[in-house]
Amino acid sequence: MAATTSSGDEPPETKSPAQLIPLLSEDVALSCLARVPRCHYPILSLVSKTFRSLPTSPLLYATRALVGATENILYVAIRIPPESGACWFTLLHRTLSNSTNSKMLVPIPSCPSPSLVGSAYVVVDSEIYVIGGSIRDVPSSSVWVLDCRFHTWRRVSNMRVGREFAAAGVIDGKIYVIGGCVVDNWARSINWAEMFDIKTQTWEPVASPGMEVREKWMHASAVMEGKVYAMADRNGVVYEPKEKKWEMPEKRLDLGWRGRACVIENILYCYDYLGKIRGYDPKERIWRELKGVESLPKFLCGATMANRGGKLTVLWEGKAGSGGSRRMEIWCAEIDVGRRGEREIWGKIEWSGTVLTVPNESAIVNCLAATV
């Protein structure tokens, strides 16, 4: 006999949760959906109520990693007047009706502390760490993290001292931050360099080099061969965590490194004083011009680079508008780079074009690629 309620009515039937894809098990359906390129997620969320929350599901991204369907997505910070802090964007790839690809920078939520200037940036898997920076010329010890899966921000433990224009790099699950503070007291002296353990979420001081090499501001940083390179206007430093050893950078590297750079297959790429892209091989200790990209403009200023899945992505500021135009174009190019023989590095431009238009006097702060 069927159970009844105290009033004699039949109990309401419990509805089973809707299936993602009818006739498929949840595991199989999730495995299929995880392979859909991320640029289609906004459309995917419109398919049904069941799909609506799918793009914000941690299980979906865990499945993407499990089935090898992750993508390298470009994120860009741009300072746009009158804002003093950075506005954040991500590069969106769209396929148009005529089967051509369209690339554009689309806005995402900016850091809750938007007025930070001179922060250091590192990527750890699907997260971007924004480290320090100054607020009204006062160095901050704050650390913000952008979760690139969901475009949400959170704070983690503060550094031991405030910093601006520091260098940072990630090695073996630890973030090393160097410089960016004046060594004018005991606390700043022992914390001129410090390390953040991602697993324990704690900061520890790193034994610093001598006073003569402890610069305040760093203009560039990178990780090569298990070492963090921190470059200043003079007296750059190199730290090797495994040996806990400090050393000076090779002179040829120091003289040739200009602006934002990135490392691909252990070659450091940046642009030189003539605006040409060059690559530095730390084993051979030599700079070589990147050939095959002569159609790109000369990057005299306002350019930055990122390693996006093994491709060299270059972002630069186009010419500012003149006359009645008060707008400036942001350009992007993606280059397939690699060695040719023993003495040459070549690049093939896979695409290049305008990805955003911004007011004059805007400036690219940084670009990074995260895995999602």
Curated annotation (Swiss-Prot):
Gene3D superfamilies: Kelch-type beta propeller. Keywords: Kelch repeat, Repeat, Ubl conjugation pathway. The keyword Repeat applies. Kelch repeats lie at residues 127-173, 175-226, 228-260, 261-307. One of its GO terms (biological process) is protein ubiquitination. The keyword Repeat applies. Residues 19-66 form the F-box domain. It comes from the Eukaryota. Pathway: Protein modification; protein ubiquitination. Part of a SCF (SKP1-cullin-F-box) protein ligase complex. Interacts with SKP1A/ASK1. This is F-box/kelch-repeat protein SKIP6. It comes from Arabidopsis thaliana (Mouse-ear cress). The lineage of its organism: Eukaryota, Viridiplantae, Streptophyta, Embryophyta, Tracheophyta.
